Amino acid sequence: MAQATGPHRRRWPTALAGLLLALLLVGCSAVAAGLNSYQSPDGRYAFLYPTGWTRVQVEGGPQVVFHDLINSDETLSLVVSEVASDKALTDLGSAVAVGENLRRRVIAPEGSGRSAELVEAREREQQGRVFYDLEYRVRLADRDRHELATAVVDRGRLYTLAASTNELRWPKVKELFERVIISFNLLV
């Protein structure tokens, strides 16, 4: 087997390193493809939302709402609630307990005409903070929906970011919604 000698032998590692760097950069850009970033005006939190979605104002509703211009029933919303300033998310209960509480009180309260099932509840840590990631199947009178949410507590506030779509579109947007939900981050 012939071996490269001279200047060709020295170019091989450089070319390989260049190729690996190019592949890495393409992979990184693909992860964020189709997403835009949003940061609160006070710089307190940030998250990613799908390209092509627009922000809408909802009077008396969530603090931030985005929806898809094409599939108007796909939404992303951030609700900020007050909790005791000395409470951590884990003080409110486990991921399952908090998920069930949200299901009963917010997603499908009695008399709403909706029913919901908590499909999955898990805890994750990000930058020293505990997050609960929650997945729901929601049944309305005329259609079924799927919802992903994440919850975190900071300085007396419970932040709940939720992405929702109809059940038929769920398989197509599942990975995108997962990236959106785990992108939620407290900055200060």
Segments (PLM) and residue ranges:
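Short, low-complexity, disordered segments immediately C-terminal to signal peptides
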Residues: 33-43, 62
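Soluble non-cytosolic domains of exported or imported proteins
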Residues: 44, 92-100, 167, 171-175
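Proline-anchored loop/turn motifs at beta-strand termini and strand-loop-strand connectors
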Residues: 42-59
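Conserved polar/disulfide-associated segments of primarily extracytoplasmic proteins
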Residues: 56-153, 158
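C-terminal motif of bacterial Sec signal peptides marking the signal peptidase cleavage site
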Residues: 24-27
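Surface-exposed amphipathic alpha-helical segments
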Residues: 155-188
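Bacterial N-terminal signal peptides that target proteins for export
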Residues: 2-17
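Bacterial signal peptide processing site
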Residues: 29-31
